[in-house]
Amino acid sequence: VRNLVEFILRSGDLDNSSGGFGERDAMQAGTRVHQQIQKKRGADYRAEVPLVHEKEYEHFILRVEGRADGMYEDGTTTVIEEIKGTYRDLETMEEPVPVHLAQAKCYAYIYGLQNRKEEMGVLMTYTLLSSEEEGLLRPLTKEEVKPENSNWRIRHFLQTYKLPELEQWFDELLDAWFIWAEFQYQWQKARDASMQHLEFPFPYRKGQRELVSGVYRTILRKKELFVQAPTGIGKTMSTVFPAIRAIGEGCGDRLFYLTAKTITRTVAEEAVSILKEKGLQFKAITLTAKEKMCILDEPECDPIHCPRAKGHFDRINA
């Protein structure tokens, strides 16, 4: 669910400076506050509720699954709770983050559909995180975690949706995803077809045919292969070519070629380019260190210092 809504709905700026804390620190703090809130919700509260929904298309089946942070009954209405930890000022927060709300709405729709509900409640709960460097904040009280209460430590947003409203919203979300998924399907179909009759682009050198066969068989058998060979035998093409052919046979979807030096990276790029000239349809990217790629003197991935960070997610989702 999270991957789906982030892929379709994520917008705004790229900002790695938010809060100034490390990702690992935030995850640990987030786990603590999740558990605090869940334990204080009462005996009827269900935590970490697994939900699964499948929709069949012509060429594939979409399986949407995830875990709702919590669920409880409020009178005749079932409420799905999504808990998010944050370092931002909660007192100035006027509404939930759209991507966070979308995640909870997906859970609400799936549960409502499967349990024939007429309406569903969605409770977004934001709570202030503390870093290990700051020291832990005192535990939240039972009174503070009540949905009707909000303060500088915790903020709640409760909304109720009719199931037809959720259904229309969810269908539009999947329709947006389908455009990309169908494109991916057709691309992979064309890619795999181009690999079926791909031939080794050069006459084989001594030992090269054995290396190509060894790499290919190793991938098919899901084993590991360690090779020591002299310079000039053509190791790069002899490993890239059979790996790509194996992808065409359904043995994988991506190929990672790791290098320690720029020159070996360049040789790998040239190998893929040569195969493309022979008819291969294949997308290849080179991952380069941020420090080498950045247009700034010092990498600062935030909308204030970097024009490329400003509106980054608006552009990639356009």
Task: Pin down the residues of each PLM region.
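Alpha-helical scaffold elements adjacent to nucleotide-binding pockets in ATP/GTP-utilizing enzyme cores
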Residues: 103-106, 169, 242, 267-275
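Metal-dependent nuclease catalytic cores that hydrolyze phosphodiester bonds in DNA/RNA
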Residues: 1-77, 102
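Walker A/P-loop
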Residues: 220-242, 254
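Conserved pre-motif I regulatory segment
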Residues: 184-228
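Mg2+/Mn2+-dependent nuclease catalytic core
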Residues: 53-166, 239
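A substrate-engagement module of RecA-like helicase motors
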Residues: 184-193, 198-199, 251-318
